Curated annotation (Swiss-Prot):
GO BP term, example: translation
Stored SUPFAM superfamilies: Ribosomal protein L16p/L10e
Complex formation: Part of the 50S ribosomal subunit.
Keywords annotated in UniProt: Ribonucleoprotein, Ribosomal protein, RNA-binding, rRNA-binding, tRNA-binding
Family stated for the protein in its record: Belongs to the universal ribosomal protein uL16 family.
Gene: rplP
Keyword Metal-binding: no
Protein name listed in UniProt: Large ribosomal subunit protein uL16
PANTHER family associated with the record: 50S/60S RIBOSOMAL PROTEIN L16 (PTHR12220), LARGE RIBOSOMAL SUBUNIT PROTEIN UL16M (PTHR12220:SF13)
Gene3D superfamilies: Ribosomal protein L10e/L16 (3.90.1170.10)
Gene Ontology cellular-component terms listed: cytosolic large ribosomal subunit
Single GO MF annotation: rRNA binding
């Protein structure tokens, strides 16, 4: 499960999810990826479920990059507890995802396999996603 090793503060404000993603909007490491179409919180369990779905379909072939990291803690109060008396205990970790952010990248497999693997992964996520390919500039891939 993905989570930070240590954090400065155990509890965080929820924050706003306005606008589009600032960075990470293009496929850089792999050949194919899925891009978020909506904004949402994605939990570390959803990320792990999507990763397992992809790698199982690819039969351990190819390489997968996870481009998001759950660095934001969310809290919850126990069931049947009255309002007030402080903020709840940390419950889990989420990644804040905005539209345009590339979530996962794949390389080393054919486009058909990548499309299906990423489709299976997208079913594990709470947002609409879109399949994207690496854009080639001037006939060459943008690798440095």
């Amino acid at each position: 499960m993905l989570m930070p090793k240590r954090v400065k503060y155990r509890r965080e404000h929820r924050g706003k999810m306005r606008g589009r993603a600032k960075g990470g909007t293009e496929v850089h490491f792999g050949e194919y990826g899925i891009q978020a179409q909506e904004s949402s919180w994605i939990t570390n369990r959803q990320i792990e479920a999507a990763r397992i779905a992809m790698t199982r379909y690819m039969k351990r072939g190819g390489k997968v990059w996870i481009k998001i990291f759950p660095s934001k803690p969310y809290t919850a109060k126990p069931l049947e507890v009255r309002m007030g008396s402080g903020k709840g205990a940390p419950e889990g970790w989420v990644a804040v995802v905005k539209p345009g952010k590339v979530l996962f990248e794949i390389s080393g497999v054919s486009e058909e396999v990548a499309r299906e693997a990423l489709r299976l992964a997208s079913h594990k996520l709470p947002i609409k996603t879109k399949f994207v390919k690496r854009e080639e500039i001037g006939g060459e891939s943008n690798e440095s």
